[in-house]
Amino acid sequence: FLCPDTVMLIRDREEKNMKKRHYGKMLLLFGAAYMPMMGCGTKENSKMDIKDMTTRDTEFHTELFGGNTYIFSPEDDPKQVAETLDAIYEKQEANQFGEERYAIYFMPGEYDETIEANVGFYTQVAGLGELPTDTKLQSLQCTARWLADDPSNHNACCNFWRGVENMELETNTMWAVSQATFMRRVQVDGALFLHDEYGWCSGGFLADSNTDLMTDSGSQQ
């Protein structure tokens, strides 16, 4: 049994919620009507120049997703993209038990051939297109050169905790990994090597992917 005051309070709340939902629908309809108008204009106005990434940091990841999430666009300065990727890999190549985590996303399009993504610990690299072929990256690699002091050591048995998905890789790709990793929905235009010069490696997950030339499992179990 509810007293009259409680019933009135519930009704008031319901009316307020209905108004909020109605307001939200109006905003959605307005946005849908406004979006086509945003695409209008001359061909010259629709062209996108190379962007300085420093103006995009706040917009794309610092405020929305946190400082360790990067969303790149084909219109970004290739040099800055490459420098950012290199800096992340320098931190994460041997960061086996570190606390840092990185998510690197590429918007659909074809990226400059100077951009190479090396994937270290606790790093996810992904394309944001509907299909893997919507996002074309020249090169992506995961090598096994960090374990022990000998640079000729190619043991990938500790290359854990990383992944790549939903993109097209336009050259030969090395993905020398072990457990707790994934490669899925990837188109490799060249050959795919699942080892680093036949060094030890064991595990990994590969699915829904296509290789144009060959997939060399090598020493991979």
Stretches with model-predicted labels:
Residues 107, 126-131, 138, 165-170, ...:
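Feature marks extracellular polysaccharide-active and adherence modules
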Residues 49-83:
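Right-handed parallel beta-helix/beta-solenoid
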Residues 52-57, 64-65, 183, 188, ...:
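Predominantly polar beta-repeat domains that present long G/T/S/D/N-rich surfaces used to bind, process
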Residues 70, 74-124, 130-133, 140-142:
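N-terminal extracellular ligand-recognition/capping segment immediately after the signal peptide
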Residues 19-27:
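Bacterial N-terminal signal peptides that target proteins for export
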Residues 1-17:
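Short, Lys/Arg-enriched N-terminal segments with co-localized hydrophobic residues
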Residues 126, 150-172, 179-188:
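Parallel beta-helix/beta-solenoid
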Residues 37-39:
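C-terminal motif of bacterial Sec signal peptides marking the signal peptidase cleavage site
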